[in-house]
Amino acid sequence: ENTQDSPELPQVSKISVSYNEKNFLFNPEEIDYVEANDGKVFVYVKREQYTGAFRMGELEEKLARFGFFRCHRSYIVNMQKVVELVKWTRNSYSLRLSGYEKTDVPLSKGKIQELRSMYEF
């Protein structure tokens, strides 16, 4: 009897989403940001909106090692896509992503310090 452990299977890191009743698989680095709205989770890739069938917490966990940051309870952003930190008031900021010039992703007050320590601004 073979008691050797089988080699570990590679970690599958694709994220599955749907659009018009079709299913798609994206590599995490293709994803721009994720938004939770009205009980649904939307995944944005190249300005297209897809629907995901998962909770924000589990997605945050899956994406953290790919450079994603939970900047707000309703948003997770791919930090590689962030091009600007927009200041609204003394303690209020949002993030602007490449290709989304008209979309500002909110940054929670509680997350500002975390981001500051990551990027030293």
PLM region descriptions:
Residues 1-106:
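Conserved binding/recognition cores within well-folded domains
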